């Protein structure tokens, strides 16, 4: 398993080959916060051993950026190893997390703060995108944004069966509002990126949203949508995006012509 890489002051990233997912550790004078716990107990145990090798302190909390299995199934392993530490997530994410994970019990609707003494972590739910319950973690003093799967580097954004294609661009616009030209952005999957990368990905997602909205509004059948436009992503990345997007477009009921 790979070691941690320090990408900013006391912010370490462990990029795990399984699903190319990132586990992040943020340190402060009161301890460490782990963001996302990987896809299995075995992966979580390996991460715990690597955290010990950092020699940076004890884990005092866990954060789940959303509810997908590759980000939460190590929750129980971390909680057991560190004597019942709290797991934080949005209310939406916790409600959708596999009970076996187990789900976060410290939840919030819009924003929360974890105080590590000499630094604070801001947990913010900006809106729907990859899921209904995505959050980002901002570390202001280090100018770092942990974006979860709202941003992906090693593959196109995962527009899955529980995504919100028409909402995602606006949510990512809000995330960009939390960054500067120097911000280090850690995606849910892949290597660390910068603000420009996120801007480009947001533009691609906006193209997807606008194209779906245009096709649906013009009455193009959902089954014909993929072949009826140019898209920024390959077909297999849009398999769920098109039906999900079509379902979000309001339908105007047909009316009889006036005479």
Locate the predicted segments by residue.
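Conserved beta-strand hairpin/beta-sheet module of binuclear metal-dependent hydrolase folds
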Residues: 2-50, 135-148
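Solvent-exposed loop/turn segments at secondary-structure junctions
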Residues: 19-20, 39-41, 67-71, 93-96, ...
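Active-site neighborhood of phospho(di)ester-bond hydrolases with catalytic His/Asp-centered motifs
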Residues: 35-37, 58-68, 88-92, 126, ...
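Active-site HxH/HxHxD metal-binding segment of metal-dependent hydrolases
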Residues: 45, 49-115
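Accessory terminal helices/loops
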Residues: 177, 192-259
